[in-house]
Amino acid sequence: MSTVASAPAALKGGEWIIRESKPEDIFTPEDFNEEQKMIMGMCTTFVSNEVLPIIERIDKLEPGLMPSLLDKAGEQGLLGVSIPEEYGGLGKDFVTSTLVNEGLGSGFSFSVAIAAHTGIGTLPILYFGTPEQKQKYIPKLTTGEWKGSYGLTEPNSGSDALSAKTSAKLSSDGKYYLLNGQKCWITNGG
């Protein structure tokens, strides 16, 4: 039995469909190390203790409830599992991050909120941001002080990003952006 479950080199695009997998590239729950199991347990405990008891209040969109849950998740390090330590994250590997997603996955709409925060709001900055952007945004997103949100769907284009009409134009003084357009909803917008 392996002492550490780790993923092989990253696949590109849909390569997993056409590439043959070697048995040593496959891992099962029996291969997870103690730390990975502990983190997974922390996630399932978080959902059981913090999310599920108030699920009806979440479903009724009680103001401030979802942001407070994201704050609690940030306090426990759950918003920064795959974020490098230099930005305040835990710096864990892909397998551990996947276990966190599985552990939080039973949290109904909370699972969507945390996935949008990390997968749409934080990770693109980590992967594609400038060093200045990473330093400015990632630490506060990792703690939950700032919330990652996402607004795609528009009345006349649905969720077709290429048909979106909303624009962002830099102000004449270069200090902020002026947004112009409509969105049907914004994930984590409240």
Explain the meaning of each model-derived region:
Residues 46-57, 148-149:
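Short alpha-helical functional segments enriched in proximate histidine and acidic residues
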Residues 54-75:
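Short secondary-structure junction/hinge motifs that connect adjacent elements
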Residues 12, 75-144, 188-189:
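Internal helix-loop-helix
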